[in-house]
Amino acid sequence: MSIIEAIILGLVQGLTEFLPISSSGHLRIVAAFSGWPDPGAAFTAVSQIGTELAVLIYFRKDVGNILATWFRSLGNKELRRHIDARMGWYVIIGSIPIGVAGLLFEEQISAPFRDLRLTALTLIVFGVLLGMVDRYSRKHRELTDLNAQRGLIYGLFQMLALIPGVSRSGATVTGGMLMGFKREAAARYAFLLAMPAVFASGLYKLKDIGGNEYAGVGATIVGTLVAFAVGYAVIAWFMRFISTNSFMPFVYYRIALGILILALVSFGVLTPESGAEFEGSAASVTAAEATH
């Protein structure tokens, strides 16, 4: 992978990570349109560390309070009912489904889920679902209404993001609004919930950088730094946007992009596996999996 490719893919990662339009799906699509090999699971996972660092900095006060109160509550029963202490447990509980599913279905995620037709269909289907929930759900709950059961349901929706095109933020925000949470509350918890899974996935995939993956160490570092810088600006804008707007612009975009991809595949402009393989210098290897 060239530095220019890394910059472009880092830009795509940063622009799409926090929007409900699927960053992994867009990385897959951009590679197909550009004629590049699929950037691979390791690049996708590690570059997401950059965007999650942006979340960590943007929500640093929330994260600091949650960590401090949660640790103190381990030895202080009176603190265990505090919202920050409970939030720590809810994030842990909500992270279990995607961790288990990611390990159990790693092989299935590797190849079949990279098919452009599936990416297009998930963009459309989950876009329609997001639109319906956003328009018709009764959004009245705040984060103080979160409990262990709702935290687990959030986690089950996040698990769907293992399929490119679903969108981690889109799936979890949809699940949150379906349970009655307001847009800002649903998004805030979705971003906090993503941190353990994304950091764990990125660290787990670090070992694959520079091996048979298309992206080398230098390109991955560049892409991650670009994703961090762009991601911070996007999350700041996105939280302001949803305070006064609905998710419908993203819904229309998802549906339009999904239809476009299906049309291009149908007419033979793209193949379902476009950009899915990377010919290494020593041998041909299949570019692997999705994380977001």
UniProtKB/Swiss-Prot annotation:
Supply the gene name: uppP
GO MF, one term, reads: undecaprenyl-diphosphatase activity
Protein's UniProt name:
Undecaprenyl-diphosphatase
Q: What is its EC number?
A: 3.6.1.27
- Lineage top rank: taxon: Bacteria
**Transmembrane residues, as ranges?**
87-107, 113-133, 190-210, 219-239, 250-270
One Gene Ontology biological process: peptidoglycan biosynthetic process
Root EC class: hydrolase
One GO cellular component assignment for this chain's record is:
plasma membrane
> In which organism is this protein found?
Thermobifida fusca (strain YX)
- Extra info from the record? Bacitracin is thought to be involved in the inhibition of peptidoglycan synthesis by sequestering undecaprenyl diphosphate, thereby reducing the pool of lipid carrier available.
Would you identify the family this protein belongs to, as annotated? Answer: Belongs to the UppP family.
Where does this protein reside within or beyond the cell? Cell membrane
Q: What does this protein do?
A: Catalyzes the dephosphorylation of undecaprenyl diphosphate (UPP). Confers resistance to bacitracin.
Catalysed reactions, semicolon-separated = di-trans,octa-cis-undecaprenyl diphosphate + H2O = di-trans,octa-cis-undecaprenyl phosphate + phosphate + H(+)
Membrane topology recorded in Swiss-Prot or TrEMBL: Multi-pass membrane protein
